[in-house]
Protein backbone atom coordinates (compact mmCIF):
# COMPACT_ATOMS: atom_id res chain seq x y z
CA UNK A 1 0.00 0.00 0.00
CA UNK A 2 1.30 3.42 -0.94
CA UNK A 3 1.63 5.45 2.28
CA UNK A 4 2.45 8.87 0.84
CA UNK A 5 -0.06 11.70 1.00
CA UNK A 6 -0.91 13.60 -2.16
CA UNK A 7 -1.92 17.22 -1.65
CA UNK A 8 -4.26 18.17 -4.47
CA UNK A 9 -3.15 21.54 -5.82
CA UNK A 10 -5.41 24.49 -6.50
CA UNK A 11 -4.60 24.11 -10.20
CA UNK A 12 -5.80 20.50 -10.13
CA UNK A 13 -9.04 21.57 -8.45
CA UNK A 14 -9.51 24.35 -10.99
CA UNK A 15 -9.31 21.67 -13.67
CA UNK A 16 -12.19 19.87 -11.96
CA UNK A 17 -14.21 23.09 -11.78
CA UNK A 18 -13.59 23.50 -15.52
CA UNK A 19 -15.14 20.06 -16.03
CA UNK A 20 -18.14 21.26 -13.99
CA UNK A 21 -18.51 24.18 -16.39
CA UNK A 22 -18.25 21.87 -19.40
CA UNK A 23 -20.94 19.58 -18.00
CA UNK A 24 -23.23 22.54 -17.32
CA UNK A 25 -22.67 23.72 -20.90
CA UNK A 26 -23.68 20.30 -22.25
CA UNK A 27 -27.01 20.52 -20.46
CA UNK A 28 -27.54 24.13 -21.53
CA UNK A 29 -27.24 22.93 -25.12
CA UNK A 30 -30.02 20.43 -24.42
CA UNK A 31 -32.14 23.22 -22.99
CA UNK A 32 -33.06 21.62 -19.69
CA UNK A 33 -31.95 21.38 -16.05
CA UNK A 34 -30.69 17.86 -15.19
CA UNK A 35 -31.29 16.09 -11.87
CA UNK A 36 -29.10 13.92 -9.66
CA UNK A 37 -29.60 11.57 -6.73
CA UNK A 38 -26.89 10.62 -4.22
CA UNK A 39 -27.57 7.59 -2.00
CA UNK A 40 -25.32 7.25 1.04
CA UNK A 41 -24.50 4.10 3.00
CA UNK A 42 -22.45 3.78 6.17
CA UNK A 43 -20.65 6.21 8.41
CA UNK A 44 -20.58 9.95 8.94
CA UNK A 45 -17.45 10.24 6.80
CA UNK A 46 -19.50 8.93 3.89
CA UNK A 47 -22.16 11.52 4.70
CA UNK A 48 -19.49 14.21 4.50
CA UNK A 49 -18.20 12.79 1.21
CA UNK A 50 -21.73 12.81 -0.22
CA UNK A 51 -21.99 16.50 0.60
CA UNK A 52 -18.97 17.03 -1.67
CA UNK A 53 -20.49 14.90 -4.42
CA UNK A 54 -23.66 16.98 -4.25
CA UNK A 55 -21.51 20.12 -4.29
CA UNK A 56 -19.81 19.07 -7.50
CA UNK A 57 -23.14 18.07 -9.06
CA UNK A 58 -24.76 21.39 -8.16
CA UNK A 59 -21.81 23.28 -9.62
CA UNK A 60 -22.26 21.20 -12.78
CA UNK A 61 -25.85 22.41 -13.15
CA UNK A 62 -27.75 19.51 -11.57
CA UNK A 63 -30.73 19.80 -9.26
CA UNK A 64 -30.48 17.37 -6.35
CA UNK A 65 -33.56 15.14 -5.96
CA UNK A 66 -34.47 12.47 -3.40
CA UNK A 67 -35.01 9.37 -5.56
CA UNK A 68 -33.27 7.46 -8.33
CA UNK A 69 -36.40 7.34 -10.50
CA UNK A 70 -36.16 10.12 -13.05
CA UNK A 71 -32.63 11.19 -12.08
CA UNK A 72 -30.13 11.84 -14.87
CA UNK A 73 -27.29 10.84 -12.53
CA UNK A 74 -27.40 8.33 -9.67
CA UNK A 75 -24.41 8.05 -7.31
CA UNK A 76 -24.22 5.26 -4.73
CA UNK A 77 -21.70 6.16 -2.03
CA UNK A 78 -21.03 2.82 -0.39
CA UNK A 79 -19.82 1.23 2.84
CA UNK A 80 -17.62 -1.88 3.09
CA UNK A 81 -17.57 -2.39 6.86
CA UNK A 82 -20.04 -5.30 6.89
CA UNK A 83 -21.23 -7.85 4.36
CA UNK A 84 -24.87 -6.89 4.89
CA UNK A 85 -24.16 -3.34 3.70
CA UNK A 86 -22.46 -4.65 0.55
CA UNK A 87 -25.33 -7.00 -0.25
CA UNK A 88 -27.79 -4.11 0.10
CA UNK A 89 -25.76 -2.12 -2.41
CA UNK A 90 -25.64 -4.95 -4.93
CA UNK A 91 -29.37 -5.52 -4.51
CA UNK A 92 -30.13 -1.86 -5.09
CA UNK A 93 -27.73 -1.74 -8.04
CA UNK A 94 -29.62 -4.64 -9.58
CA UNK A 95 -32.92 -2.82 -9.09
CA UNK A 96 -31.52 0.16 -11.00
CA UNK A 97 -31.50 -1.93 -14.19
CA UNK A 98 -35.28 -1.39 -14.34
CA UNK A 99 -34.90 2.33 -13.70
CA UNK A 100 -32.34 2.60 -16.47
CA UNK A 101 -34.58 0.74 -18.94
CA UNK A 102 -37.16 3.47 -18.41
CA UNK A 103 -34.49 6.18 -18.63
CA UNK A 104 -31.71 4.80 -20.90
CA UNK A 105 -29.59 7.96 -20.69
CA UNK A 106 -29.38 7.75 -16.90
CA UNK A 107 -25.77 7.53 -15.66
CA UNK A 108 -25.05 5.34 -12.63
CA UNK A 109 -21.92 5.56 -10.47
CA UNK A 110 -20.62 3.53 -7.55
CA UNK A 111 -18.10 5.12 -5.20
CA UNK A 112 -17.06 4.99 -1.55
CA UNK A 113 -15.32 2.21 0.33
CA UNK A 114 -16.71 -0.68 -1.74
CA UNK A 115 -15.19 0.89 -4.84
CA UNK A 116 -11.76 0.47 -3.25
CA UNK A 117 -12.13 -3.32 -3.18
CA UNK A 118 -10.69 -5.05 -6.25
CA UNK A 119 -13.29 -7.82 -6.09
CA UNK A 120 -16.09 -5.26 -6.19
CA UNK A 121 -14.81 -3.35 -9.22
CA UNK A 122 -14.29 -6.67 -11.03
CA UNK A 123 -17.83 -7.77 -10.19
CA UNK A 124 -19.21 -4.46 -11.47
CA UNK A 125 -17.28 -4.84 -14.73
CA UNK A 126 -18.54 -8.37 -15.30
CA UNK A 127 -22.08 -8.42 -13.90
CA UNK A 128 -23.42 -4.86 -13.81
CA UNK A 129 -23.02 -3.42 -17.32
CA UNK A 130 -25.56 -0.68 -16.56
CA UNK A 131 -23.13 0.93 -14.08
CA UNK A 132 -21.27 3.68 -15.94
CA UNK A 133 -18.50 4.52 -13.49
CA UNK A 134 -16.70 3.31 -10.38
CA UNK A 135 -14.30 5.45 -8.36
CA UNK A 136 -12.67 4.91 -4.97
CA UNK A 137 -12.45 7.43 -2.12
CA UNK A 138 -8.98 8.45 -3.35
CA UNK A 139 -10.56 9.69 -6.59
CA UNK A 140 -13.59 11.52 -5.21
CA UNK A 141 -11.95 14.87 -5.97
CA UNK A 142 -11.94 13.86 -9.68
CA UNK A 143 -15.68 13.21 -9.89
CA UNK A 144 -16.40 16.03 -12.40
CA UNK A 145 -13.75 14.63 -14.74
CA UNK A 146 -15.18 11.12 -14.40
CA UNK A 147 -18.72 12.32 -15.03
CA UNK A 148 -17.68 14.40 -18.04
CA UNK A 149 -15.85 11.44 -19.57
CA UNK A 150 -18.91 9.22 -19.15
CA UNK A 151 -21.15 11.85 -20.75
CA UNK A 152 -18.88 12.57 -23.72
CA UNK A 153 -16.95 9.36 -24.38
CA UNK A 154 -19.94 7.04 -23.95
CA UNK A 155 -17.81 4.42 -22.23
CA UNK A 156 -17.46 3.20 -18.67
CA UNK A 157 -14.93 4.80 -16.33
CA UNK A 158 -13.03 2.96 -13.58
CA UNK A 159 -10.87 5.09 -11.26
CA UNK A 160 -9.86 2.47 -8.72
CA UNK A 161 -6.07 2.26 -8.95
CA UNK A 162 -4.13 1.93 -5.67
CA UNK A 163 -3.36 5.62 -5.36
CA UNK A 164 -1.76 7.33 -2.38
CA UNK A 165 -4.16 8.99 0.01
CA UNK A 166 -5.05 12.52 -1.02
CA UNK A 167 -6.28 15.69 0.64
CA UNK A 168 -8.21 18.20 -1.45
CA UNK A 169 -9.22 21.55 0.03
CA UNK A 170 -11.94 23.67 -1.51
CA UNK A 171 -14.34 21.08 -2.93
CA UNK A 172 -17.83 22.65 -2.88
CA UNK A 173 -20.32 21.10 -0.46
CA UNK A 174 -24.09 20.95 -0.30
CA UNK A 175 -24.72 20.19 3.36
CA UNK A 176 -27.73 18.35 4.74
CA UNK A 177 -28.34 20.96 7.43
CA UNK A 178 -27.60 24.60 8.17
CA UNK A 179 -27.61 23.91 11.91
CA UNK A 180 -25.31 20.89 11.99
CA UNK A 181 -22.19 20.09 10.03
CA UNK A 182 -19.60 17.38 9.55
CA UNK A 183 -16.00 18.59 9.36
CA UNK A 184 -13.41 16.00 8.34
CA UNK A 185 -10.13 16.65 10.12
CA UNK A 186 -8.27 13.59 8.82
CA UNK A 187 -8.67 10.59 6.56
CA UNK A 188 -7.58 6.96 6.65
CA UNK A 189 -6.38 4.73 9.46
CA UNK A 190 -3.10 3.16 10.60
CA UNK A 191 -4.46 0.79 13.23
CA UNK A 192 -5.20 -2.29 11.09
CA UNK A 193 -7.63 -3.99 13.44
CA UNK A 194 -7.82 -7.56 12.20
CA UNK A 195 -11.54 -7.37 11.36
CA UNK A 196 -11.54 -3.97 9.63
CA UNK A 197 -11.15 -3.16 5.95
CA UNK A 198 -10.98 0.63 6.33
CA UNK A 199 -7.16 1.00 6.10
CA UNK A 200 -7.23 -0.96 2.84
CA UNK A 201 -9.95 1.11 1.17
CA UNK A 202 -9.40 4.57 2.71
CA UNK A 203 -5.62 4.48 2.99
CA UNK A 204 -3.23 5.50 5.73
CA UNK A 205 -3.78 8.35 8.17
CA UNK A 206 -3.39 11.86 6.82
CA UNK A 207 -4.34 15.05 8.62
CA UNK A 208 -5.69 18.29 7.24
CA UNK A 209 -3.77 21.42 8.14
CA UNK A 210 -5.19 23.07 11.28
CA UNK A 211 -5.62 26.43 9.55
CA UNK A 212 -7.84 24.79 6.91
CA UNK A 213 -9.99 23.16 9.59
CA UNK A 214 -10.28 26.39 11.57
CA UNK A 215 -11.22 28.33 8.45
CA UNK A 216 -13.99 25.84 7.65
CA UNK A 217 -15.31 26.05 11.22
CA UNK A 218 -15.29 29.86 11.15
CA UNK A 219 -17.26 29.86 7.90
CA UNK A 220 -19.80 27.41 9.32
CA UNK A 221 -20.29 29.44 12.50
CA UNK A 222 -20.67 32.64 10.49
CA UNK A 223 -23.36 30.90 8.40
CA UNK A 224 -25.35 29.98 11.52
CA UNK A 225 -24.11 26.45 12.25
CA UNK A 226 -24.63 25.52 15.91
CA UNK A 227 -23.34 21.94 16.07
CA UNK A 228 -20.03 20.89 14.50
CA UNK A 229 -18.88 17.26 14.49
CA UNK A 230 -15.20 16.65 13.75
CA UNK A 231 -14.67 13.43 11.81
CA UNK A 232 -11.86 10.93 11.44
CA UNK A 233 -11.41 7.17 11.54
CA UNK A 234 -9.33 7.86 14.67
CA UNK A 235 -9.43 11.54 15.59
CA UNK A 236 -6.98 10.97 18.44
CA UNK A 237 -4.24 10.35 15.87
CA UNK A 238 -4.75 13.81 14.38
CA UNK A 239 -1.53 15.69 13.71
CA UNK A 240 0.91 12.80 14.01
CA UNK A 241 1.81 13.23 10.35
CA UNK A 242 2.08 17.04 10.52
CA UNK A 243 4.94 19.29 11.43
CA UNK A 244 4.30 21.78 14.19
CA UNK A 245 3.24 19.60 17.08
CA UNK A 246 -0.54 20.28 17.17
CA UNK A 247 -2.38 17.20 18.37
CA UNK A 248 -6.11 16.55 18.57
CA UNK A 249 -6.56 18.08 22.02
CA UNK A 250 -4.79 21.24 20.81
CA UNK A 251 -7.08 21.39 17.76
CA UNK A 252 -10.17 20.98 19.94
CA UNK A 253 -9.03 23.82 22.19
CA UNK A 254 -8.37 26.08 19.20
CA UNK A 255 -11.86 25.49 17.77
CA UNK A 256 -13.47 25.91 21.20
CA UNK A 257 -11.95 29.38 21.44
CA UNK A 258 -13.61 30.61 18.24
CA UNK A 259 -16.30 33.25 18.88
CA UNK A 260 -19.96 32.31 18.61
CA UNK A 261 -22.57 30.05 20.21
CA UNK A 262 -21.99 26.48 19.09
CA UNK A 263 -21.08 22.98 20.25
CA UNK A 264 -18.21 20.76 19.10
CA UNK A 265 -18.46 16.99 18.92
CA UNK A 266 -16.08 14.44 17.46
CA UNK A 267 -15.86 10.83 16.38
CA UNK A 268 -14.36 8.33 16.38
CA UNK A 269 -11.83 7.99 19.21
CA UNK A 270 -9.54 4.99 19.56
CA UNK A 271 -8.87 3.99 23.19
CA UNK A 272 -5.15 3.46 22.55
CA UNK A 273 -4.73 7.22 21.97
CA UNK A 274 -7.42 8.58 24.29
CA UNK A 275 -5.51 10.06 27.22
CA UNK A 276 -5.79 12.53 30.06
CA UNK A 277 -4.90 15.55 27.90
CA UNK A 278 -7.94 14.94 25.69
CA UNK A 279 -10.33 14.51 28.61
CA UNK A 280 -8.90 17.51 30.47
CA UNK A 281 -9.40 19.62 27.34
CA UNK A 282 -13.00 18.44 26.98
CA UNK A 283 -13.67 19.37 30.61
CA UNK A 284 -12.03 22.79 30.27
CA UNK A 285 -14.13 24.20 27.40
CA UNK A 286 -17.93 24.52 27.64
CA UNK A 287 -18.25 24.54 23.85
CA UNK A 288 -16.93 20.96 23.68
CA UNK A 289 -19.91 18.65 24.17
CA UNK A 290 -19.72 16.44 27.24
CA UNK A 291 -20.12 13.41 25.00
CA UNK A 292 -17.63 10.68 24.11
CA UNK A 293 -17.88 7.79 21.67
CA UNK A 294 -15.13 5.36 22.73
CA UNK A 295 -15.43 1.91 21.07
CA UNK A 296 -14.35 -0.99 23.27
CA UNK A 297 -15.37 -3.82 20.84
CA UNK A 298 -14.91 -6.58 23.46
CA UNK A 299 -14.61 -6.90 27.22
CA UNK A 300 -12.05 -9.71 26.88
CA UNK A 301 -8.36 -8.81 26.80
CA UNK A 302 -7.60 -11.96 24.81
CA UNK A 303 -10.17 -11.08 22.17
CA UNK A 304 -8.90 -7.49 22.06
CA UNK A 305 -5.41 -8.80 21.36
CA UNK A 306 -6.75 -11.01 18.57
CA UNK A 307 -8.48 -7.92 17.18
CA UNK A 308 -5.14 -6.01 17.27
CA UNK A 309 -6.76 -3.21 19.27
CA UNK A 310 -3.55 -2.24 21.14
CA UNK A 311 -5.18 -2.00 24.58
CA UNK A 312 -6.64 -4.40 27.12
CA UNK A 313 -9.69 -4.32 29.37
CA UNK A 314 -7.81 -2.65 32.22
CA UNK A 315 -6.38 0.15 30.06
CA UNK A 316 -9.81 0.83 28.58
CA UNK A 317 -11.44 1.04 32.00
CA UNK A 318 -8.64 3.30 33.22
CA UNK A 319 -9.38 5.76 30.39
CA UNK A 320 -13.15 5.65 31.01
CA UNK A 321 -12.77 6.12 34.75
CA UNK A 322 -10.54 9.17 34.29
CA UNK A 323 -12.89 10.69 31.72
CA UNK A 324 -15.83 10.30 34.11
CA UNK A 325 -13.81 11.74 36.99
CA UNK A 326 -13.22 15.04 35.17
CA UNK A 327 -16.64 15.05 33.43
CA UNK A 328 -19.22 13.66 35.89
CA UNK A 329 -22.07 14.30 33.43
CA UNK A 330 -20.31 12.57 30.52
CA UNK A 331 -22.56 10.86 27.99
CA UNK A 332 -20.63 7.76 26.94
CA UNK A 333 -21.37 5.58 23.92
CA UNK A 334 -19.43 2.75 22.33
CA UNK A 335 -19.21 0.02 19.67
CA UNK A 336 -19.11 -3.69 20.42
CA UNK A 337 -18.66 -6.76 18.22
CA UNK A 338 -20.35 -10.01 19.20
CA UNK A 339 -19.08 -13.36 17.93
CA UNK A 340 -15.53 -12.46 16.94
CA UNK A 341 -13.77 -15.66 15.78
CA UNK A 342 -12.90 -17.80 18.79
CA UNK A 343 -14.91 -15.77 21.31
CA UNK A 344 -15.92 -18.15 24.11
CA UNK A 345 -18.99 -17.91 26.31
CA UNK A 346 -16.76 -16.79 29.18
CA UNK A 347 -15.25 -14.04 27.02
CA UNK A 348 -18.69 -12.89 25.98
CA UNK A 349 -19.60 -12.69 29.67
CA UNK A 350 -16.60 -10.39 30.12
CA UNK A 351 -18.21 -8.07 27.57
CA UNK A 352 -21.48 -8.16 29.51
CA UNK A 353 -19.76 -7.36 32.81
CA UNK A 354 -17.86 -4.46 31.23
CA UNK A 355 -21.14 -3.00 29.93
CA UNK A 356 -22.69 -3.35 33.38
CA UNK A 357 -19.64 -1.79 35.02
CA UNK A 358 -19.31 1.20 32.69
CA UNK A 359 -23.04 1.91 32.23
CA UNK A 360 -23.04 3.23 28.66
CA UNK A 361 -25.74 5.62 27.59
CA UNK A 362 -25.99 3.72 24.30
CA UNK A 363 -24.19 1.03 22.33
CA UNK A 364 -23.84 0.33 18.63
CA UNK A 365 -23.81 -3.46 18.50
CA UNK A 366 -22.75 -5.70 15.64
CA UNK A 367 -22.35 -9.39 14.95
CA UNK A 368 -18.90 -10.12 13.49
CA UNK A 369 -18.89 -9.85 9.70
CA UNK A 370 -15.83 -11.32 7.91
CA UNK A 371 -14.26 -8.96 5.37
CA UNK A 372 -12.24 -10.50 2.56
CA UNK A 373 -8.61 -9.43 2.79
CA UNK A 374 -8.56 -8.90 6.55
CA UNK A 375 -6.74 -11.31 8.93
CA UNK A 376 -9.92 -12.09 10.89
CA UNK A 377 -11.62 -13.42 7.76
CA UNK A 378 -9.31 -16.45 7.79
CA UNK A 379 -9.46 -17.13 11.54
CA UNK A 380 -11.10 -20.32 12.80
CA UNK A 381 -14.66 -19.47 13.77
CA UNK A 382 -16.41 -22.46 15.41
CA UNK A 383 -19.28 -20.53 17.04
CA UNK A 384 -22.61 -21.26 15.28
CA UNK A 385 -24.61 -18.36 13.88
CA UNK A 386 -27.50 -19.20 16.20
CA UNK A 387 -25.24 -18.80 19.23
CA UNK A 388 -23.95 -15.45 17.96
CA UNK A 389 -27.53 -14.29 17.51
CA UNK A 390 -28.37 -15.38 21.06
CA UNK A 391 -25.42 -13.44 22.46
CA UNK A 392 -26.34 -10.41 20.38
CA UNK A 393 -29.94 -10.43 21.65
CA UNK A 394 -28.80 -10.79 25.26
CA UNK A 395 -26.31 -7.95 24.95
CA UNK A 396 -28.96 -5.66 23.43
CA UNK A 397 -31.40 -6.49 26.23
CA UNK A 398 -28.80 -5.67 28.89
CA UNK A 399 -27.90 -2.38 27.24
CA UNK A 400 -31.52 -1.34 26.57
CA UNK A 401 -32.30 -1.74 30.26
CA UNK A 402 -29.30 0.41 31.17
CA UNK A 403 -30.22 3.08 28.62
CA UNK A 404 -33.77 3.34 29.95
CA UNK A 405 -32.49 3.43 33.53
CA UNK A 406 -30.14 6.32 32.68
CA UNK A 407 -32.91 8.17 30.84
CA UNK A 408 -35.20 7.89 33.86
CA UNK A 409 -32.64 9.79 35.96
CA UNK A 410 -33.15 12.84 33.72
CA UNK A 411 -36.79 13.32 34.67
CA UNK A 412 -37.04 16.62 36.54
CA UNK A 413 -33.70 17.93 35.29
CA UNK A 414 -33.38 20.99 33.06
CA UNK A 415 -31.05 20.51 30.08
CA UNK A 416 -29.67 22.92 27.51
CA UNK A 417 -30.75 21.66 24.08
CA UNK A 418 -30.39 22.68 20.45
CA UNK A 419 -33.82 22.79 18.80
CA UNK A 420 -33.28 21.18 15.41
CA UNK A 421 -36.61 20.30 13.80
CA UNK A 422 -40.15 18.99 13.99
CA UNK A 423 -41.71 15.57 14.56
CA UNK A 424 -45.41 15.79 13.72
CA UNK A 425 -46.95 18.25 16.20
CA UNK A 426 -43.86 18.46 18.44
CA UNK A 427 -40.48 20.11 18.11
CA UNK A 428 -37.31 18.04 18.40
CA UNK A 429 -34.08 18.98 20.11
CA UNK A 430 -30.79 17.40 21.07
CA UNK A 431 -29.14 17.63 24.45
CA UNK A 432 -25.44 18.36 24.71
CA UNK A 433 -24.98 14.61 25.03
CA UNK A 434 -26.92 13.97 21.83
CA UNK A 435 -30.14 12.69 23.37
CA UNK A 436 -33.36 13.26 21.44
CA UNK A 437 -35.94 15.43 23.24
CA UNK A 438 -39.50 16.12 22.03
CA UNK A 439 -41.43 19.11 23.35
CA UNK A 440 -44.14 21.62 22.44
CA UNK A 441 -43.04 24.99 21.10
CA UNK A 442 -43.08 27.51 18.27
CA UNK A 443 -41.29 26.90 14.97
CA UNK A 444 -39.29 30.08 15.61
CA UNK A 445 -37.29 28.17 18.24
CA UNK A 446 -35.68 25.96 15.60
CA UNK A 447 -31.99 26.82 15.41
CA UNK A 448 -31.75 28.12 18.97
CA UNK A 449 -30.48 26.72 22.25
CA UNK A 450 -33.23 26.32 24.85
CA UNK A 451 -33.47 25.04 28.41
CA UNK A 452 -35.92 22.13 28.56
CA UNK A 453 -37.17 20.43 31.72
CA UNK A 454 -37.46 16.67 31.19
CA UNK A 455 -40.86 15.20 32.05
CA UNK A 456 -40.71 11.72 30.52
CA UNK A 457 -38.26 9.11 29.27
CA UNK A 458 -38.08 5.93 27.21
CA UNK A 459 -35.16 3.76 26.11
CA UNK A 460 -34.57 5.92 23.04
CA UNK A 461 -35.75 9.46 23.77
CA UNK A 462 -36.91 12.09 26.26
CA UNK A 463 -39.92 14.40 26.45
CA UNK A 464 -40.04 17.76 28.17
CA UNK A 465 -41.31 21.31 28.50
CA UNK A 466 -39.63 24.64 27.93
CA UNK A 467 -38.16 25.82 31.23
State the predicted function of each range.
Residues 90-94, 210, 244-250, 312, ...:
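Charged helix-capping and loop-helix junction motifs
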Amino acid sequence: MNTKTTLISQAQLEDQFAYCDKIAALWQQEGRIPSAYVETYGCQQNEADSEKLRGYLTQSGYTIIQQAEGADVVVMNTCAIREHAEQRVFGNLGALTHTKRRHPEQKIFLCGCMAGETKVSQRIRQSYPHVDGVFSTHHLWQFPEILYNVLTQKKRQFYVADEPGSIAEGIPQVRDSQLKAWVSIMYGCNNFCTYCIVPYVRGRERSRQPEDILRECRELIAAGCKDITLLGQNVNSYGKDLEGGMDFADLLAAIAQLPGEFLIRFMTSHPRDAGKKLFDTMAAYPKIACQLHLPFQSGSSRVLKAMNRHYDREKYLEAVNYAKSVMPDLVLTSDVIVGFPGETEEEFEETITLIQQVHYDALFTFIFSPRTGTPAASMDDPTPKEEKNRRFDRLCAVQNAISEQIHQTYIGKTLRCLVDGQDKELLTARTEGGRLVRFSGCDSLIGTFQNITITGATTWSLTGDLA
